[in-house]
Amino acid sequence: MLGPSVILVGLSIGSGEFVLWPRLTVEWGFALFWACWTGVTLQFFLNMEIERWTLATGESAVIGFVRLSRFWAPAFLLCSTVPWIWPGWATGAATLLSWEIDVPIVPGAIAGLVACGLTLSVGPVVYRTVETIQVVLVAVIFAGLIVLTALLVEPATVGDLAAGAFRFGHMPDGVHMPMLLGALAFAGAGGSVNLAQSNYIKDKGYGMGRWVGRITSPFTGREESGSEVGAVFEESAENEARWRVWWRNANAEHFLSFYLLALLSLALFCLVAATLLPAGSAVGQDFDFIGSEAGVLAERFGPWGRHLFLATGIAVLFSTELALLDAVARVSADLLQVSLRLYFGRESNLSRLYFGVVWTLIAFGVLVLLAGFDRPLTLLVLSAALNAVVMFFYSGLLLWLNVRSFGGPLRVRPFRIAVLVTSLLFFGFFSGLTLLDQLGWVG
């Protein structure tokens, strides 16, 4: 069952793990690591409720939201696109590449965006293309990360991280709230892209998703018939037993492929950052702190240490941009298809909508870069903070949808209901606190 959750890991590594949490660690030590692992734990349970809906119905979770109210079709179309239209990941990868070879950042970022679009467009079945690339890139990233950790990290630093993991509620004075809010969302895949887990397990053929068509390339793939409308299996002892197998396997796959890998990468990247740049070090502007980390590695191990670190970072950010374009386009295409039917009575082809969204996102990203918005950290923090607010909304919607819809063996257990309520309160609290902070009403 390996596959769908590895794509989410590739998404999560690319900003929260590599950029935001290491930066917060350099500024504040491990004082906020309790919030880090709490965020990724909540995302595990959120993602499993997304999977519950799709395993049982074959529909994506956003279609379930539209069943609650047609209002959620245009609302989530905005939520699934606006936070992700800023090309921070391609810009970040181009920034690191420019430190290695003499390549201007903006042309490099544009080339990266176009390369991602072409990669998604040429594979016959898009899911297989993305899964294969993400598995390889995640393996490369972890190999580089493990080598760095083994060479650098001391046991005492691990002890400091463990202590910070249990300082629940501790908030250092002066922490930049939008960055913390974004880091909470990106402790995991974050925001609306978690909803794409529905699409991944559909295309993988899990549960009732087996009966729904996949997204195929208009250039190299064979069109598959399908509908955004799913179906619930008939009640019988045999089907209930099959459901229990589906649910058990899905939980195991997501726990191993997403939760453990995301938590491990968060811990290792933060440990490496804390070892290279002691708490309280100057982080500078934008990606300056990553350059400082690379500089320390060059001093300790020579040029190869710097090259290994920056190559890992480029792989991290490129894999994230690729997976983001795919995930955002999947969720948006579902919502466009159902919106066209609900509001205009028009039928549409899901694959064509998907590729239309992919290339529209790329075109907008190019315009943003040409307009001079080429600071990757600013773009990442903006995207992350907006996505944390989106997570607040869909925590409540998933709770409403699944508790209302499922009974018997499919029902949501009390413990998971409690976790969804906790997620709603957690992301709601930090979103509200960030808003008040930006208005100057706290501090």
Q: Which residues are covered by each model-predicted region?
A:
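Extracellular/periplasmic helix-exit of transmembrane alpha-helices
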Residues: F45-I50, G226-A241, A262-I290
